[in-house]
Amino acid sequence: MLALHEWGARADPPLLLVHGLTESATAWPDAVARWSSRYHVLAIDQRGHGASPRWDDETLARAPQTMQEDLEKTLALFSEPPVVVAHSLGGLVSLRVSVAWPELVRALVLEDVARPTGHWAPAPWFVEHQERFLDAFADGGAAERERMRRETSWSESEIEGWAACKRRVDRRYIREGTYLGEADLVSAINRLRIPTLYLAPRRGDMAPEPSEVTNPLVRLVLLDGVGHCVRRDAPEAYHGLVDPFIEAVFAGTGR
């Protein structure tokens, strides 16, 4: 089973946070601080990240399916469906699970979902890039922390959370498992049967075109002045959209 972290009162409405590549459950510090007084906040370490199990030959041979099954098993533990809040790779996994098992997810918040291109093996350029990136944290990542302080508006807690999880990434997954499989982003979005808020940068290269989203349950919001991690680049804009959405979802169910 995946490692599961939790904050807040168990009697409160549940949120499940699903992180992206090279991150972990502890890389949401500001969101957790904001939400844990009102919600039971849980977050997973995806396989090969944080304290979760490492990858092996069998799981790597079907990496996208393995990640989907990992999340399905976690959701099956909940006594009631949570609102799932997910970023990048975690967004794609959560999207696919929500399409396959809508009864396990109350609603979905997606942040710049990783876009699959139909490949079934890692791209060498991507592997090389990620390996170099993670190598920069071999000494704890002091230089990378300083770079992010110079180049971004992220809070200190977010920079620390982002940096701290890098040394716990399973490098074998980076080398052998970072492929996303079927190019199903748009079709999956339009097959969702739960309320969904999808945030992405307007100048990004992964979000669907607004005209492609024909599902009335999905609200796609493209934001200016942000990059891949919307919640860190523009936390007030992010929470100004996400918090009312979550509140409305639970209000509609009597929670």
Model-derived features: where do they sit?
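Active-site loop/oxyanion-hole signature of alpha/beta-hydrolase fold enzymes
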Residues: A33, L42-V85, G240, P244
